[in-house]
């Protein structure tokens, strides 16, 4: 594909930095040494919690929430700086660090996150995920969602979500007209239809989201994301 200056402009406008952020891949599971102090018994509001001292199979269902800008940059229980754009989570007792698959039981969307913080300590919520994870799970506007969490043991296959249809959110808009215009331009510039992948507009609570998919595997979704990243890289580096 020959990139003219007009095409470069259109590509940059059609596929911005925000879209790359929302289309990022899940956390990469790897064996890590458990944090010494973050896994000690602790007390919050008069209640004592005893974190698990090893990564093992574990499943839990309940409500999830997410935390964002107010906590961005603050230290987590694991001593790292919280990044709302990374795929991380807070849990009251799971080992730090460890990995879990979180599945939204309402829409079947799932994401793998790295547990590096403690919480949530209010209401009946079982896990707090980052803003990026909430976006991928499709509940960033609602604030909470009913989820299933499954501990992933490094070296074992990650649990597979029941709904294998995977979508990548490209960008969100306030009106359907804006979303449709973006979809038309993106389809033209990226030739999405030629790869057998469709673009569509989904109306969510307060926004219209242009998404790419469905994909039947994380690998295929990652390939599509890499292709999109490569296209944007070409846009940014072409002279």
From Swiss-Prot:
Coiled-coil regions, chain positions: none
Region forming the signal peptide: 1-25
Gene3D superfamilies, sorted: RlpA-like domain (2.40.40.10)
UniProt cross-references to InterPro entries, sorted A to Z: RlpA, RlpA-like_DPBB, RlpA-like_sf, RplA, SPOR-like_dom
Single Gene Ontology MF annotation: peptidoglycan binding
UniProt keyword list: Cell wall biogenesis/degradation, Lyase, Signal
PROSITE patterns: SPOR
SUPFAM superfamilies according to UniProt: Barwin-like endoglucanases
Disulfide bonds: none
Domain SPOR intervals: 160-239
Annotated EC: 4.2.2.-
Class of this enzyme: lyase
Domain of life according to the entry: Bacteria
GO biological process, one term: peptidoglycan metabolic process
Family stated for the protein in its record: Belongs to the RlpA family.
Function: Lytic transglycosylase with a strong preference for naked glycan strands that lack stem peptides.
UniProt name for this protein: Endolytic peptidoglycan transglycosylase RlpA
Organism: Neisseria meningitidis serogroup B (strain ATCC BAA-335 / MC58)
């Amino acid at each position: 594909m020959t990139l003219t200056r007009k095409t470069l402009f259109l590509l940059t406008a059609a596929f911005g930095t925000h879209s790359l952020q929302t289309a990022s891949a899940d956390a990469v599971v790897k064996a890590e040494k458990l944090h010494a102090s973050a896994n000690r018994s602790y007390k919050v509001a008069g209640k004592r919690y005893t974190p698990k001292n090893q990564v093992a199979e574990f499943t839990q269902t309940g409500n999830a929430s997410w935390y964002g800008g107010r906590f961005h940059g603050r230290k987590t229980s694991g001593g790292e700086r919280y990044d709302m754009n990374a795929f991380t989570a807070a849990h009251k007792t799971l080992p730090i660090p460890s990995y879990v698959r979180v599945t939204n039981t309402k829409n079947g969307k799932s994401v793998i996150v790295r547990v590096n913080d403690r919480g949530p300590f209010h209401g009946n919520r079982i896990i707090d995920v980052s803003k990026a994870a909430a976006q991928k799970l499709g509940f960033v506007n609602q604030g909470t969602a009913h989820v299933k969490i499954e501990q992933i043991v490094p070296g074992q296959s990650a649990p597979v979500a029941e709904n294998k249809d995977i979508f990548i959110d490209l960008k969100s808009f306030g009106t359907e007209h804006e979303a449709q215009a973006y979809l038309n331009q993106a389809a033209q510039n990226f030739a999405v239809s030629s790869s057998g992948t469709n673009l569509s507009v989904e109306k969510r609570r307060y926004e219209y989201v242009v998404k790419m998919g469905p994909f039947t595997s994380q690998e295929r979704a990652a390939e599509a994301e890499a292709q999109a990243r490569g296209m944007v890289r070409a846009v940014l580096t072409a002279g």
